[in-house]
């Protein structure tokens, strides 16, 4: 919004508002976006926590889980609303409203946030321990993920929505046989010119998997004070750098990455996500005053997945978000092994003491803060590995 306002003022009053040219610089707007989201979160955080407490929106804790967590019963949840509102206000202020990629990320983020909000509301307010039925939740996630995937399949290769429509119609007219341009290929990191052509259906499937998978993986990771939000900040910031490089024709050519016009504007969203995340961490650090709930975790995971697809770094997201991947795999392996052994031996057995993985380490005697900080350190290292793919080829 401020970009359009600055352009209008410079156009009508160039002598008085020439200093507003600084708003055209993407890096300046990214810094301001992060600061705006951070300040909004810090200022309104206490009020949001008080309101959640007054409304008795408290976190239920499983009695058969880690016993030290029972003291957290009643801690306000659904604090992800604070994160999302901070991101929304900051992004809307500082990004170029004509950029279609930011709108796609915003729609996915708030679509998944709405799913999480309904899930949290049913759990906490309506006292339904299951929240949304898993099938219902997956249905809505799939709907949003598929809509985004179909649009992105054609938009990452074109510079405008009109050209996106033309590409789509050519694909339909070819009997669904035309391939996508090379920009839509799956990039294999650490290799100079290695990519895999996905085709339209392959791109849609991969995009759907990345968006929905990332959303659920972040949600599964959000089980300890501060555990999920800091990796989200780190991975989101790293993806912001990829967006900046991919959106710049000079840098992308030098680093042998596909140039996606308009992708650089995603840096504004990533900066807002980092600022809002750090503000939330102020209140979510041990001992947490508030939890983000599904409304925050599902939304942030969906945002990371969507950004990774747009900047063509799906594999790198898996590297940098390795903690999210391992946490999700730990749950899948635990459930699958339990069902298999119960069917074969009549009694279910477990691979881990408790899933997700962070609870396994708690059961082994690690303190909660040890698990959290060590997972942060691992994420920092993985983000450095991911960023190294910019040059190490």
UniProtKB/Swiss-Prot annotation:
GO MF annotation list: metal ion binding; phospho-N-acetylmuramoyl-pentapeptide-transferase activity; UDP-N-acetylmuramoyl-L-alanyl-D-glutamyl-meso-2,6-diaminopimelyl-D-alanyl-D-alanine:undecaprenyl-phosphate transferase activity
Cofactor requirements of the protein: Mg(2+)
Membrane-spanning segments: 29-49, 75-95, 101-121, 138-158, 194-214, 226-246, 263-283, 290-310, 315-335, 370-390
Keywords: Cell cycle, Cell division, Cell inner membrane, Cell membrane, Cell shape, Cell wall biogenesis/degradation, Magnesium, Membrane, Metal-binding, Peptidoglycan synthesis, Transferase, Transmembrane, Transmembrane helix
Top-tier EC class: transferase
Reactions catalysed, as given in the entry: UDP-N-acetyl-alpha-D-muramoyl-L-alanyl-gamma-D-glutamyl-meso-2,6-diaminopimeloyl-D-alanyl-D-alanine + di-trans,octa-cis-undecaprenyl phosphate = di-trans,octa-cis-undecaprenyl diphospho-N-acetyl-alpha-D-muramoyl-L-alanyl-D-glutamyl-meso-2,6-diaminopimeloyl-D-alanyl-D-alanine + UMP
GO BP: any one term: regulation of cell shape
One GO CC annotation: plasma membrane
Identification of the protein by name: Phospho-N-acetylmuramoyl-pentapeptide-transferase
Species assigned in the record: Leptothrix cholodnii (strain ATCC 51168 / LMG 8142 / SP-6) (Leptothrix discophora (strain SP-6))
Taxonomy of the source species: Bacteria, Pseudomonadati, Pseudomonadota, Betaproteobacteria, Burkholderiales
């Amino acid at each position: 919004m401020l970009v359009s306002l600055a352009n209008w003022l410079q156009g009508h009053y160039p002598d008085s508002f020439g200093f507003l040219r600084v708003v055209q610089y993407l890096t300046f707007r990214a810094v301001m976006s992060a600061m705006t989201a951070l300040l909004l979160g810090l200022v309104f955080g206490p009020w949001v926590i008080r309101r959640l407490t007054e409304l008795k929106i408290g976190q239920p804790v499983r009695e058969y889980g880690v016993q030290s967590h029972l003291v957290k019963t009643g801690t306000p949840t659904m604090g992800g609303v604070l994160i999302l509102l901070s991101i929304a206000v900051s992004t809307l202020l500082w990004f170029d409203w004509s950029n279609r990629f930011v709108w796609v990320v915003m729609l996915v983020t708030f679509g998944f946030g709405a799913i999480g909000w309904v899930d949290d509301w049913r759990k906490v307010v309506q006292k339904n321990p299951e929240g949304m039925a898993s099938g219902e939740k997956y249905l809505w996630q799939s709907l949003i993920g598929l809509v985004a995937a179909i649009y992105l399949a054609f938009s990452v290769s074109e510079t405008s929505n009109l050209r996106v429509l033309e590409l789509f119609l050519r694909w339909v007219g070819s009997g669904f046989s035309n391939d996508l341009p090379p920009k839509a290929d799956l990039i294999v990191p650490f290799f100079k010119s290695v990519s895999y052509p996905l085709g339209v259906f392959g791109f849609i499937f991969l995009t759907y998997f990345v968006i929905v998978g990332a959303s659920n993986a972040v949600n599964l990771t959000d089980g300890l004070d501060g555990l999920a939000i800091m990796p989200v900040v780190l991975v989101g910031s790293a993806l912001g750098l990829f967006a900046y490089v991919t959106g710049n024709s000079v840098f992308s050519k030098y680093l042998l990455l596909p140039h996606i016009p308009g992708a650089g504007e995603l840096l504004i969203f990533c900066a807002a996500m980092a600022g809002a995340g750090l503000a939330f961490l102020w209140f979510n650090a041990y001992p947490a005053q508030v939890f983000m709930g599904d409304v925050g975790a599902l939304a942030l995971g969906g945002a990371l997945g969507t950004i990774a697809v747009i900047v063509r770094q799906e594999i790198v997201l898996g590297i940098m978000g390795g903690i999210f991947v391992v946490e999700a795999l730990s749950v899948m392996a635990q459930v699958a092994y339990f069902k298999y052994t119960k069917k074969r031996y009549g009694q279910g057995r477990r691979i881990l003491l408790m899933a997700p993985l962070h609870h396994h380490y708690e059961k082994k005697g690690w303190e909660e803060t040890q698990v959290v900080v060590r997972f942060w350190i691992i994420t920092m290292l993985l983000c450095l590995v991911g960023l190294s793919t910019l040059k190490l080829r």
